[in-house]
Amino acid sequence: YKEEVIGKDSLDVEVIWETLYNKARPFGQQGIAMNALSGIDIALWDLNGKQLKQPISRLIGGRFREKLAAYATGFYRLDGKKYPETSVEDALKFKEEGFTAMKLKVGFTPEKDIEYIRSIRKAVGPDVRLMVDFNACYSQAVARRIILELVPENIYFYEEILTPEDMEGYKALRNLTASYMAAGEEIFGKIEINNWLKNGALDIYQPDVSSAGGITECKKM
């Protein structure tokens, strides 16, 4: 990519993106080639914003809103800590700080995950919105069981409960529950996400700007 970027005008960000994308075609439109392209694209937008003394949000067309709702996340497992006790303490601290939504990290075993989520729900009460990130670790059969057992906990969305290859599984789970199905960190580019959209596989799409093609591509997704 170096020779296609060094010495070029950073304002030609769309031209540079297309040039790099076409050059990467033999290596596929996913994985490390797209990761590298994404990083270059983000850097170009950052440079343009600094040179023009404007936020990138304005450069890509402007802001529809000035505020966004925030949720607390984290809840990572640390050696030497007891769980779910440590996470219950963290959740209560977040609630005291004013957070009304939290996203939990799970994906250990179905039994541990169910117990963990129930413990957090019991601690924070029914008015806190809970989302759960499974890091793409379960089969459709196991995910179905988890979702059905957690119906009373009123989970707002299930994130990456299946592997990114299992589009049909996501479609089935989406029709199983009133909770939203979320994924997308491993969906690369507008062409791939269009397949998911056409199949109605998800409720919430979460492309990762650092791997899905950068700001230029994510704006089109």
Task: Give the role of each language-model region.
Residues 13, 56-59, 160-164:
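Flexible, glycine/charged-enriched surface loops at secondary-structure junctions
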Residues 1-51:
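Metal- or metallocofactor-binding catalytic centers and their adjacent structured scaffolds
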Residues 57-79, 116, 123-127, 175:
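N-terminal small/glycine-rich loop or linker at the start of catalytic domains
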Residues 104-107, 111-221:
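Catalytic core of soluble alpha/beta enzymes
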Residues 66-88, 106, 133-140, 182:
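Active-site mouth loops of central-metabolism enzymes
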Residues 55-60, 85-93:
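Short, charged beta->alpha transition segments
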Residues 38, 66, 97, 153, ...:
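Structured loop/turn residues at beta-strand edges in well-structured enzyme cores
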Residues 90-105:
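Catalytic domains of carbohydrate-active enzymes, especially glycoside hydrolases
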